[in-house]
């Protein structure tokens, strides 16, 4: 049974997303950006087991004309995950990030 979690929805500024229970492994995480003209963003994906300290497991660089996407697969499950937009630029640029297992 597949499980999808929206880690970020229409993020238009730098932001730390909320913590979510990580979907079971194996799974994938995909971030995308859309806007007008040249758009770019950097999305960090963090995990933790202790409920306190985050560990960045992947940094996704998104860059394109009107849209771009990047992602990765994971094979280990952590208790929680989140996505963070650490940089974003471009007219009307918004970032989405989804975890799927």
Q: PLM ranges: what are they?
A:
Residues 10-24, 48, 70, 92:
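Short Trp-Ser/Thr-centered turn/loop motifs at beta-strand boundaries
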Residues 2, 19, 50-59:
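Tryptophan-centered short beta-strand motifs
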Residues 38-55, 95-98:
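Short, surface-exposed beta-strand/strand-loop-strand elements in extracellular ectodomains
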Residues 18-26, 32, 99-101:
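Extracellular and organelle-lumenal recognition/adhesion modules and their flexible linkers in secreted
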Residues 1-13, 98-101:
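Short, intrinsically disordered N-terminal pre-domain segments
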Residues 6-10, 56-65:
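Solvent-exposed serine/threonine-rich low-complexity stretches and specific carbohydrate-binding patches
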């Amino acid at each position: 049974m597949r499980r999808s979690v929206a880690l970020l929805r229409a993020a238009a500024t730098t932001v730390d997303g909320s913590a979510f229970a990580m979907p079971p492994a194996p799974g994938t995480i995909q971030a995308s950006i859309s806007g007008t003209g040249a758009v770019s963003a950097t999305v960090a994906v963090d995990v933790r087991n202790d409920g306190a300290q985050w560990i960045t497991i992947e940094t996704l660089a998104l860059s394109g004309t009107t849209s771009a996407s990047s992602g990765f697969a994971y094979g280990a499950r952590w208790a929680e995950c989140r996505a963070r937009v650490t940089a974003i630029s471009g007219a009307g640029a918004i970032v989405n990030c989804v975890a799927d297992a």
